[in-house]
Regions:
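RNase H-like, metal-dependent nuclease domains and their acidic two-metal-ion catalytic environment used
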Residues: 1-103, 110, 114, 127-211
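Short, surface-exposed amphipathic charged segments that create phosphate/polyanion-binding patches used
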Residues: 112-122
Length: 211
């Protein structure tokens, strides 16, 4: 049973990757940071999740600097918009962290979520379930994942109120993708065909993730 904890990184054979889904507004949305631990066989374990509202600019900088000191991540993938680019630039200015911007489009968002699904279905992603906090976060993740599906019009969409945990995890997973790993491209699935087709069935949902 894996437990979420902000502890020390393992010395040998493990790498760490971070995904950040920032809040659009400080008072409405959740700011989510997810840390993945990846072993030499590309097995991935969620080792830290920070999900909070009302996170100010400087506070978020300090969160990521602390995570950087503890885990020494190979990469931080940060979902950016016009305002978030100022944040990632400042983070680069005050640290030596490898921060990459992820400019979100509908297509790119769907691609990273589909690739997250592929890792789950292949048994490569381990969810924390070892204590109450870990179970709560995992249950929220499952709930968000269950809201994603391909619609009758061929669009891959989430219909829940929030997708911040899924996006944070999907970004961390995308950061960890090595050149040897296969990566699903939506063009290959014809998800954006004008004529809807049953090309791909989302495995998300409570029946798609087993605990």
């Amino acid at each position: 049973d894996y437990v979420l904890k902000l502890g020390h990184r393992k010395d040998k054979g493990y790498k760490y990757y971070v995904g950040v889904d920032p809040a659009i507004s400080t008072d409405g949305d959740y700011n989510v940071v997810v840390v993945l631990e990846v072993d030499e066989e590309m097995n991935k374990t969620i080792v830290h999740v920070d999900r909070a509202k009302n996170v100010e600019f400087r506070e978020n900088l300090n969160k990521l600097r602390m995570i950087g000191k503890i885990f020494e991540p190979e990469q931080i993938l940060y979902e950016t918009n016009t305002f978030a680019k100022a944040f990632t630039q400042e983070l680069r200015n005050i640290s030596d962290l490898n921060v990459k911007d992820f400019d979100t489009t509908r297509k790119k968002k769907q691609e990273i979520i589909l690739n997250l699904q592929m890792n789950i279905e292949n048994g490569k992603l381990r969810f924390p379930y070892g204590d109450n906090n870990s179970r709560q976060i995992t249950n929220l993740l499952i709930e968000e994942l269950s809201m994603f599906s391909i619609t009758d019009s061929g669009r891959f969409e989430g219909v829940g109120a929030h997708d911040d945990l899924v996006m944070g995890l999907a970004l961390a997973n995308a950061a960890s993708q090595g050149p040897s790993e296969s990566f699903i491209l939506l063009d290959d699935l014809d998800v954006f065909d004008t004529q809807p087709r049953q090309r791909y069935s989302s495995g998300f949902g409570l029946t798609g993730i087993n605990f």
